[in-house]
Regions:
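Noncatalytic N-terminal accessory/assembly modules of large enzymes
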Residues: 1-210
Length: 211
């Protein structure tokens, strides 16, 4: 089996896929960590060369083979970045590669009549929003950093405390939540709204208070 192992962390979709899969393992979603079996490559369909350990994760509609490496913080395993393998229960010989968060979420759906399917669809939409917003904010981060370099200034050159706080608030906004995969999503915002209100763009706008 020819496998795609070159997943780039700079691509928003692949970055989000990594965060999602690691969160599924960490939070033990559908028994991902507690009910799965750690096996060697000889047991995996196609006998891939890498990595050495895979989780045989049995789900309602089939088996998801998850390639992992040992982890040291908050979870025993983490995704190796190699493509997962989906083996449907009704087609034991028909396997397919899974390397995108939408494919992973589709594997979790029990059946078309299960309530979880709608919830997973909603979350998939949130992930798409997070991917889009991440790409847009990444462009602004590169533009802002380039502007700072050309100006030859840093936060130390800001005389007022309020200016320094806003500077660091903007800088922190480019960092993701440490654990929630799709935290980058600002639901209901398009690119114009992000530029007008999101802290990544350091906008100025009038507050409208409700008493």
């Amino acid at each position: 089996m020819t496998r795609n192992t070159a997943l780039s962390s700079t691509d928003p979709g692949q970055y989000l896929t990594r965060r999602l899969i690691d969160a599924l393992i960490r939070e033990d979603v559908a028994g991902c960590q507690s009910d799965s079996q750690a096996v060697g490559t000889a047991t995996v369909p196609g006998s891939p060369e890498r990595p050495a350990t895979w989780l045989r994760w049995t789900l309602a509609r089939g088996v998801l083979w998850l390639p992992v490496n040992p982890a040291t913080f908050m979870q025993r395993w983490q995704w190796s970045s190699d493509a997962l393998i989906w083996q449907p229960a009704d087609q034991t010989e028909g396997v397919s590669e899974v390397d995108h968060y939408e494919q992973v979420l589709a594997c979790l759906t029990a059946n078309e009549h299960d309530d979880s399917g709608e919830q997973l669809a909603v979350y998939a939409d949130e992930c798409r929003t997070a991917e889009s917003h991440a790409a847009f904010c990444q462009k602004e981060r590169l533009r802002w950093f380039d502007e700072i370099r050309h100006q030859g200034q840093s936060w130390k050159d800001l005389s007022r405390l309020s200016e320094r706080l806003l500077y660091f608030d903007r800088l922190a906004a480019f960092l993701d939540h440490p654990f929630y995969p799709s935290a980058r999503a600002k639901s209901g915002f398009d690119e114009a709204a992000l530029a007008a209100y999101a802290p990544e763009f350091a906008p100025r706008f009038q507050l409208r208070w409700l008493a």
